[in-house]
Amino acid sequence: MRISFFHPPLEANRQQAAFIEVLQKAWEANQTTLADDQKYDLLHILGRPSHEVVEKIRCAKKKRIPILYSPLSEIAPWSEKHINHSLAKQLFIHTTGEAEYDYIKKRYSDANVILIKNPAVTVDTTQTLFNSELQQLYQQILKQHDEQVKADIDTSITKLKTPIDDEIMHAVLKGFLYLHYKYGRRQILQQDMDAQSQLMLTADYDEDKLGTILKELKLYRFVSGLETVMEKKSQLTEGFMPIPATNGRLTKHINSATL
């Protein structure tokens, strides 16, 4: 798993520094990679909800990146800064104590709030247990986020000007839309390309109609470039491509986004 980690300057915040050490031990134990590029699975943000933190969250949400936010007791009744409700409900908020959990859960009732205790400040947990719980949380976030992305794609397909009654065409289009989302994340996985190729090799649908829909969605150029990448890296062949493949600059960008 690859994550991006962000926190405000430590300054004299010993609690934050100690918790970062706990996180680092967990990442090492779980073989979690800290990414220094745009190819990561999840963004983990730590610390008080400063302007910089809020902007980081907003930017990630625009890119549809799953976010885990650990305020580390910096959101409390006496705090001057908070996250607005519309933003909070799109986050997974990690609390480290029962009082913090109860307050956050009450304040942001629509948010995903999780309690995983911090072994740096309590004997109620251990580093080993924390490692396991953090890994499970990361996996839960990725699973829920991916399910939501696919559900949103299904909804967008039902709103097309050109209606799709064919379940097979719906599935093929959904696969292209999902790969386009992953392209935006710079994270096109081999297994996802293989699944799309296999579907296209066995599917029977109106290719001309799909081409029209791809133009409606402004996905025509992307799919034509993607087909070239899929032909080279997956089992797709020309006879099963719904539109002509191209090999231009966009194709190179798509290829560089594959993992």
Feature annotation, model-predicted:
Residues W78-L91:
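A conserved, positively charged/aromatic
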Residues V53-C59, K81-I83, R107, L115:
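A short acidic, amphipathic alpha-helical/loop segment
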Residues K89-L115, A120-T122:
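A short, active-site helix/loop in glycosyltransferases that binds the activated sugar's phosphate group
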Residues R14-Q15, T122-Q136:
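A charged, aromatic-enriched C-terminal amphipathic alpha-helix characteristic of glycosyltransferases
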Residues E133-L259:
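Conserved NTP-donor binding/palm subdomain of two-metal-ion nucleotidyltransferases/polymerases, i.e.
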Residues R48-E52, E74, A99:
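Short beta->alpha connector loops
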Residues M1-I45:
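N-terminal pre-catalytic "stem/leader" segment of glycosyltransferase-like enzymes
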